[in-house]
A protein has these predicted regions:
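TPR/TPR-like (Sel1-like) alpha-helical repeat modules
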Residues: 178-185
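Short coil/turn linking the two alpha-helices of tandem helical-hairpin repeats
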Residues: 88-95, 145, 166-168
Length: 190
């Protein structure tokens, strides 16, 4: 629901009028009732928790190949970066480098602690963490993934290009886009 090219038929809308979807579509002030959860927020932080758990536990594992451990850690960082970018896009003001030091974004949770008291971080801190998570992890990932459940190197470059473009880092966006296109520059012919 982040775009403006959305249309709902009347019967669909009225069947969901009390749901968060119906409320968002009709621009209601409050999307959720007190007993409802924000599924988008909860699911994103659930994935972030899992990524944090992987990042804290994998370095202590003595068995296994170092290359595989590096790949698992890289996938966790990429996923965490993606979900923080997604959360920042949904719940924070549009990124402005001049006000990023004071604009509040989302809580920046980097440890797998379910009981931690969290506060909203400033946009500049969230953006810095997103970019840090995407930095230098591509080489730990395979050029082609073994399955659709694993992240290939091209996807990291593509995400880094998009994130840098979103935050106004145009040179880095171009550099990452060119790296991604080295793997596949063909358009899909529908």
């Amino acid at each position: 629901m982040c775009g403006d090219n959305i249309f709902m038929k009347e019967d669909y809308l009225t069947s969901y009028i009390l749901s968060d979807i119906g409320k968002a579509y009709t621009w209601q002030k409050e999307f959720y009732r007190a007993e409802e959860d924000d599924v988008t927020w909860n699911e994103a932080y659930s994935v972030i928790y899992t990524c944090n758990l992987v990042l804290s536990e994998v370095p202590g594992i003595n068995e296994g190949k170092d290359a595989y451990k590096a790949q698992v850690m890289a996938e966790a960082k990429v996923n965490r970066a993606f979900y923080y970018w997604f959360l920042h896009s949904c719940y924070a003001p549009a990124y402005d480098p001049e006000t990023a030091g004071t604009d509040l974004s989302v809580p920046l949770v980097l440890e797998p602690d379910l009981n931690a008291k969290v506060r909203r971080a400033t946009s500049d801190k969230v953006v810095a963490q997103i970019l840090e998570d995407l930095k230098d992890v591509a080489m730990d990932l395979p050029e082609k993934s073994a399955s659709e459940y694993h992240i290939p190197r091209m996807a990291v470059y593509g995400l880094a290009a998009r994130v840098n473009l979103f935050f106004g880092n145009y040179d880095a966006a171009l550099e990452n886009a060119e790296e991604a296109l080295k793997f596949n520059s063909e358009l899909v012919d529908y």
